[in-house]
Amino acid sequence: MTTIKTSNLGFPRIGLNREWKKTLEAYWKGNTDKETFLKELDGLFLSAVKTQLDQHIDIVPVSDFTHYDHVLDTAVSFNWIPKRFRSITDPVDTYFAIARGVKDAVSSEMTKWFNTNYHYIVPEYDESIEFRLTRNKQLDDYRRIKEEFGAETKPVIVGPYTFVTLAKGYEESEAKAIQKRLVPLYVQLLKELEAEGVKWVQIDEPALVTASSEDVRAAKELYESITKELSGLNVLLQTYFDSVDAYEELVSYPVQGIGLDFVHDKGRNLDQLKKHGFPKDKVLAAGVIDGRNIWKIDVEERLDAALDILSHADVEELWIQPSSSLLHVPVAKHPDEHLEKDLLNGLSYAKEKLAELGVLKEGLLSGKAAVSEQIEESKAALKALKAFATGANSAQKEELNQLTEKDFSRPASFEERLALQNESLGLPLLPTTTIGSFPQSAEVRSARQKWRKKDWTDEQYQAFINAETKRWVDIQEEIGLDVLVHGEFERTDMVEYFGEKLAGFAFTKYAWVQSYGSRCVRPPVIFGDVEFIEPMTVKDTVYAQSLTEKHMKGMLTGPVTILNWSFPRVDISRKEIAFQIGLALRKEVKALEDAGIQIIQVDEPALREGLPLKTQDWDEYLTWAAEAFRLTTSSVQNETQIHTHMCYSNFEDIVDTINDLDADVITIEHSRSHGGFLEYLKEHPYVKGLGLGVYDIHSPRVPATEEIYQIIDDALEVCPTDRFWVNPDCGLKTRQQEETVAALKNMVDAAKQARKKQAQLV
């Protein structure tokens, strides 16, 4: 008889009411002392674990909770401190300096955690690092929960293969040697856990799902070196986000358990299991509930899936768990949530997913009859959800069916458009602009709250937005920017704003998830067909344009980003959803152009993150992603300049797709790549308009004019001068006014210096 247990891989850190965010930001602002700060975070850690214990999860993780990022935790624990931060003596100050930067040292690079909306701090390797274990966080966390609750838990750590794969600063040929140098540190950490009596440790190796067979074999040697030093500690090797190609090699690792994702594996893990079986002496930790979406499960369907897995895995112990950490979904349904009943009842967040695991466990142990009530309840909830969504359906399918190839392409080539736009727009060499948003002060947030609480009328709120817009148009004029933006003060979030004005979206009040650091977002819920209702941005953009003789950019979020930053429905394909959004936005683009706006930016910062993890699956996604963008933008005249913006990406992977977007100008977050993309451009020139971000907007640090000038000068070594733009990395919403104005002044001054140099070269 197989023993069935429930397990979890990770839990949201932020708290039901974003207490984690508020605690961090109060400390960063100096409003909380260190002792109070650490005590408050400890309380949040305990609360997260207690929630899981209260849901009767058999195997609860610890050390997934962090003060900023779990990858950064691993780096700091192994003394991977970049040189520029080693003079800082306090460990907490060092930790946050790496994440956020300080006056004289830029922060470490931040990038997407695989193909999710979470960002991690990229570990930096250099030969001067003294490899040593500075802190055993896993042991500290295990002891803390044992002390507080008397509970046995499962410490979690990023594994050596994934950690080095995610790091930078070394040649590819050095990777295996660096991994081997980490082995003694893992052994030390794990032996300390073993001495404490820890029963299980979860070592996360998601990078193995994209690893070659050779690398999977090489990583096996790491685990042979690690586990041969252990005698009483059980190791669970955990993969997620996709299937493992070298399945037979992986399940032969010298560990006591293997975690596999049976949700996002496209059926491949299950096929491998059926073909090759699974070692009887190992625990199979099966991801059977989606850790990344927010929809209630069909209990019978998921129970059948778990039974199918069990029928092909002759194991003594099966753990059922989410497909990945629940970091990617909200904490729990909030008692004050305002959604329609049938929609709310069809949702399942982290806490609810743990309860669903309990139902599946009971069904596996006692049969379907034991959970018949829950089966019927889930079917009724999903039926009501479908009826609710169907009520919002539109005639958009007919519009999509009538699209032709002409609807996906501009009338003229880029070179022809460029000549017309240069004549029409009259911009200087190296034009300066920003990416869209400006700081949202406490006054802006307060005004929005007053309006939402009905303390202010629509007219009062619009008057405030207009005043703030005018103030920042004046500031931009004074700074000397060439192409202005209205500042987006009416928007809380670049996706939420559009979803609120399109049919087919629902918005929560409390369903927050972590994006990076203390930054939290509320992804929209796409429950029905997406449809344009009325112009969304025209009024505010036209007002801003009336305040200046300079060009004002229209600012939209692109269809792929809206899709990738939402919780999408699962009853139709992602491609179909993207095309629905693209068709709706196409009407907004046309409305802006008809209103006299000559530069329209359609942001796609999340285009790359939607890539499937396996390159064999890329072409299909990239093809329809580019098509959705062109569907949005191709209705405009040749004289209208289309911009797009991307951030946090390994752009080398998608340069062909960037070109296929056929945008006239693309602005790219660049400063945190520390010159990496420039190196790529030396070998692979980009011929359309390009703006490489010249300073990091995620840090309060104000870069000097000379520093920005040098970045521009370096870029012009490889980028065409007549189509290069100067801009910050991303929007400036989260920054303070003083630092924003100072940085932009320096940026404009640097651009002027660069123009002078270019004039001298002519």
Curated annotation (Swiss-Prot):
UniProt-recorded Gene Ontology molecular function terms: 5-methyltetrahydropteroyltriglutamate-homocysteine S-methyltransferase activity; zinc ion binding
A GO BP entry is:
methionine biosynthetic process
Free-text remark on how the cofactor is bound: Binds 1 zinc ion per subunit.
Q: Where does 5-methyltetrahydropteroyltri-L-glutamate bind?
A: R18, E19, W20, K21, K112, R519, C520, W565, E609
The active site of this protein is located at H698
Q: Does the keyword Ribosomal protein apply?
A: no
Keyword Zinc assigned:
yes
Q: State the reactions this protein catalyses.
A: 5-methyltetrahydropteroyltri-L-glutamate + L-homocysteine = tetrahydropteroyltri-L-glutamate + L-methionine
Q: Name one Pfam family in it.
A: Meth_synt_1
Residues binding Zn(2+), per UniProt: H645, C647, E669, C730
The record's listing under CDD domains reads: CIMS_C_terminal_like, CIMS_N_terminal_like
Q: Which family does it belong to?
A: Belongs to the vitamin-B12 independent methionine synthase family.
Task: State the protein's purpose.
Answer: Catalyzes the transfer of a methyl group from 5-methyltetrahydrofolate to homocysteine resulting in methionine formation.
- Protein name, UniProt field: 5-methyltetrahydropteroyltriglutamate--homocysteine methyltransferase
Q: Which organism is it from?
A: Bacillus velezensis (strain DSM 23117 / BGSC 10A6 / LMG 26770 / FZB42)
Its lineage opens with: Bacteria, Bacillati, Bacillota, Bacilli, Bacillales
Recorded name of the encoding gene: metE
